[in-house]
Amino acid sequence: MSRLWAVVWLLVFAVAASGCAGVPNSSAPQAIGTVERPAPPSLPKPTPGMDPDVLLREFLKATADPANRHLAARQFLTESASQSWDDAGSALLIDRVVFVETREPERVSVTMRADILGSLSDMGVFETGEGALPDPGPIELVKTTDGWRIDRLPNGVFLDWQQFQSTYKRNTLYFVDPTGTTVVPDPRYVAVSDSDQLATELVSKLIAGPRPEMANTVRNLLGAPLTLRGPVTRADGGKTGVGRGYGGARIDLENLSTTDPHSRQLLAAQIIWTLNRAGINGPYVINADGAPLDDRFTDGWESSDVAATDPGAFAGAAAGLHALMNGSLVSLDGQRAPRVAGSFGQAPNQASAAISRSGQDAASVVVLRPGAPDMQSTLWIGPLGGRAAQALEGKSLSRPSWSLDDAVWVVVDGANVVRVIQDASGAPARIPVDAGPVALEFPGPIAELQLSRDGTRAAMVIGGQVILASVEQTEGGQYALTYPRRLGFGLGETVVSLAWRTGDDIVVSRKDPQHPVSYVNLDGVNSDGPSRNLAMPVTTVAANPSTVYVADARGVVQLSPSTAEGDPTWTEVRPLMVAGTIPVLPG
């Protein structure tokens, strides 16, 4: 949120300087990238009979298209205003705009009031926000021979929310996680009206790189000095029908420095999943410096050729659903829920647990004297079905979360984030994680911390809010939580528990009886899940790409998919319908 307000105050500050602003010699990178294209036909244009109020509203709609330095919006400006208006940087998305006018026969001075709903960076990164727009300063209109035109306005861009929704489409870029195991989502908003140019736009964005907070958390195999030789075409070189039907897509790259086969496969995975998830179908013919990227795929790649990196894959799915029932770990076996073998099935007083990403190991927190002044919590880690070893202790420990490298992350006493790994001798090593940026921006106890499935992000519950941070490995091999920001302003301070459903989608349980389960994505946009057949309180949530489980007052229930009869509903997991039982999944 602090970055959003920084954008606001920069815009406000810019008003003071706008009187002496010169013609900007360059514009910021277009929010939709570098593709040259005509303005979308739906954008408004000024007409001689427009009233000043109407002209201003149409101007805000026209700012939705940044092509050619917001040429569509500049049609609403006088020549001098167009020369001095600096459209660089992020745009503020506003709604419920009110104009307060002071009129003279030939000039109108306007003060604008609005609600902030978010910001859109020059890379196409959207983040939600909230609050009233600080007064950006006066906007002045003058009567010209062509009708009213804006003669003075603040620097920066204010974007009408409704027009943004109708002009921009959300697409996802994919970069590589540090282990080279999977790809990591980076959602962007793109306003390309010509579908044949979308593939070029997305590949260009891949080459430009990830959003700033991901720069030190992912790898980009398409980074400099790699470039795109020309527009993406059909597989046969045609310029229309790119990625539609069986036409496929052809991507010609140059300056490739990657030589090893695995890195080339990861490069292909970035392109393929980015285009595939945007509805641009294969085969994907990928050439580098005039030759096939991989001689095995001269006729093109399919998504199945990079299935190992599928961002929707769930590696631990075979482990199935587990639960903590009466303090011990059980597994779901048809209509039975027997205790698992080994320590996790025998130990009492387990309050939270998680299965490893591989489904082979487990971690659980045992709590003695819960709620008492001398409460004690211990973390146990070991093979699922085998013998566990104590790894950590504290007064309180959060629900454990596994990373891709089989480290277990927990929060000790609500403040200290710790990463537990096995050292060379097999003993647990406890390594502190730098959570200083989180504590500085969002002070308060961390009630939960869950790593994304790709391990590059951490979602936390702090003060009933969802806080997202990047997981960054430092040069010394340590880890830090950086770039914290709040997600889901509409959730208030009601969040109890959270779980990653996919790399871009978080499920939360809440104290709100009207909306006990909600969703929030990486942009911060939240929506409500069904509430029918849930008994408050709803506590622990566990999720994977296909299913959501929550613990309510009766036991564990799962979200059943939509049927012909209606919307998704919560159904009982019969063997786990014991009060106090909580769901456990890999993650």
Swiss-Prot record:
It is a lipid-anchor. It comes from the Bacteria. Disulfide bonds: none annotated. It comes from Mycobacterium sp. (strain MCS). Its main location: membrane. NCBIfam families: PRK13616.1. Residues 38-47 have a biased composition (Pro residues). Residues 1-19 form the signal peptide. The keyword Membrane applies. A lipid is attached at C20 (N-palmitoyl cysteine). A lipid is attached at C20 (S-diacylglycerol cysteine). It is found in: Cell membrane. Belongs to the LpqB lipoprotein family. SMART domains: Germane (SM00909). GO terms for cellular component: plasma membrane. This is Lipoprotein LpqB.
